[in-house]
């Protein structure tokens, strides 16, 4: 996307490699660049799940080196209200939500975008996402990042055309190794800093341990498809469809020595249902029902619609057909059965490299 050189751009600075190189690229191109560090989580818990102190220090040092001003904003209360409370509510229902997608929707490309444009008088915001924006026939489209291993368009499907007009993804056309090489070349101390992984407010800690701070344990049985009790769980909401680790079962007399996987969660009966093998038929789905659909400037939107889909991040694209149910729901039918389709996660749609939208998985259509 071509923009005039005298424009003011606010870069979301996280203290990491991607946002730092993003700022450097724009600075080198002679734009009026400023940074903004967002604090989205209050660090009053003794476990220290999400300490932003080191990241802020890194962001300050980077901005000093690049000679750009760094703003600081605390969006913790907004994050709690619009992201974290939803996260807990969905887990209590037995779903597995993706707070990073909701954070993009409610915080980064809503609160941060609006603050930058309205209060800081910026023309654009920029982030270090591996995605691209192209203006084609007068419409702004969201595309996958060039680096297929790092593409983050999956997390951005909630964007709309008005937002896309004001967003820049300066590293979307680069591969990760190139970004790190740039960071080394310009002598950034964070050039070897590891990428952030996992849910942003949990960090490297175990999800189950974190959830137990907010959701009380409710012990129950782990049962096989046939109804045989083979173990105990501490709360069905602590587990996700397709989970293998942390079940505490194995070596069951009369059963094959094959790993067990969660295939269903029954909240009402408080039981966790498991089966053996990562591709057992009970884990497979022929499709799903999705809600909260967002479409991004797609001209050929008519049903049934044939396209590609992802039901989780970094999954290979799946051939599918989308059928209209009503204004709030659609049905997705896969060309081949898909494992571990998980309610609460997002399904995102593509035509070639263009992300045309997505929605929340409400339920799966089992193979059986």
UniProtKB/Swiss-Prot annotation:
The active site is at 103 (nucleophile), 200 (cysteine persulfide intermediate). Catalyzes the 2-thiolation of uridine at the wobble position (U34) of tRNA(Lys), tRNA(Glu) and tRNA(Gln), leading to the formation of s(2)U34, the first step of tRNA-mnm(5)s(2)U34 synthesis. Sulfur is provided by IscS, via a sulfur-relay system. Binds ATP and its substrate tRNAs. One of its GO terms (cellular component) is cytoplasm. GO terms for biological process: tRNA wobble position uridine thiolation. GO terms for molecular function: ATP binding; tRNA binding; tRNA-uridine 2-sulfurtransferase activity. Disulfide bonds join 103-200. This is tRNA-specific 2-thiouridylase MnmA. It catalyses: S-sulfanyl-L-cysteinyl-[protein] + uridine(34) in tRNA + AH2 + ATP = 2-thiouridine(34) in tRNA + L-cysteinyl-[protein] + A + AMP + diphosphate + H(+). Keywords: ATP-binding, Cytoplasm, Disulfide bond, Nucleotide-binding, RNA-binding, Transferase, tRNA processing, tRNA-binding. Its EC number is 2.8.1.13. It is found in: Cytoplasm. It comes from Buchnera aphidicola subsp. Acyrthosiphon pisum (strain APS). PANTHER family: MITOCHONDRIAL TRNA-SPECIFIC 2-THIOURIDYLASE 1 (PTHR11933:SF5), TRNA 5-METHYLAMINOMETHYL-2-THIOURIDYLATE -METHYLTRANSFERASE (PTHR11933). Belongs to the MnmA/TRMU family. Residues 98-100 are annotated as: Interaction with target base in tRNA.
């Amino acid at each position: 996307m071509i923009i005039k050189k005298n424009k003011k751009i606010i870069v979301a600075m996280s203290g990491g490699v991607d946002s730092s190189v993003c700022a450097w690229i724009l600075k080198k191109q002679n734009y009026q660049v400023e940074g903004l560090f967002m604090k989205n989580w209050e660090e009053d818990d003794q476990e220290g799940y999400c300490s932003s102190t080191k990241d802020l220090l890194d962001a300050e040092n980077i901005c000093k080196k690049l000679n750009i001003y760094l703003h600081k904003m605390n969006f913790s209360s907004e994050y709690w209200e619009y992201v974290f409370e939803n996260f807990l509510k969905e887990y209590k229902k037995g779903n597995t939500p993706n707070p990073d997608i909701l954070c993009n929707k409610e915080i980064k490309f809503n609160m941060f975008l609006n603050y930058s444009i309205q209060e800081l008088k910026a023309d654009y915001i920029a982030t270090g996402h591996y995605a691209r924006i192209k203006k084609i026939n007068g419409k702004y489209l969201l595309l996958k990042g060039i680096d297929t291993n790092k593409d983050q368009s999956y997390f951005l499907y909630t964007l709309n055309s008005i937002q896309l007009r004001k967003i820049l993804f300066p590293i979307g056309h680069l591969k990760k190794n190139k970004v790190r090489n740039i960071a080394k070349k310009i002598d950034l101390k964070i050039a070897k800093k590891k990428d952030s992984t996992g849910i942003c407010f949990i960090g490297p800690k175990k999800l189950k341990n974190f959830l137990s701070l907010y959701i009380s344990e409710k012990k129950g049985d782990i049962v096989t498809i046939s109804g045989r009790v083979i173990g105990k769980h501490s709360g069905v909401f602590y587990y996700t469809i397709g989970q293998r680790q942390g079940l505490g079962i194995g070596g069951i007399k009369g059963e094959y020595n094959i790993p067990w996987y969660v295939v269903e969660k029954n909240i009402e009966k408080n039981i966790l249902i498991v089966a053996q093998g990562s591709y057992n038929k009970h884990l497979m789905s022929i499709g799903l029902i999705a809600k909260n659909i967002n479409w991004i400037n797609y001209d050929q939107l008519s049903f049934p619609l044939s396209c590609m889909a992802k039901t989780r991040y970094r999954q290979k694209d799946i051939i599918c057909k989308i059928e209209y149910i009503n204004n709030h729901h659609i049905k997705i039918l896969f060309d081949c059965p898909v494992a571990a389709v998980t309610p609460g996660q997002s399904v995102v749609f593509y035509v070639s490299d263009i992300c045309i939208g997505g929605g929340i998985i409400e339920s799966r259509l089992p193979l059986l």
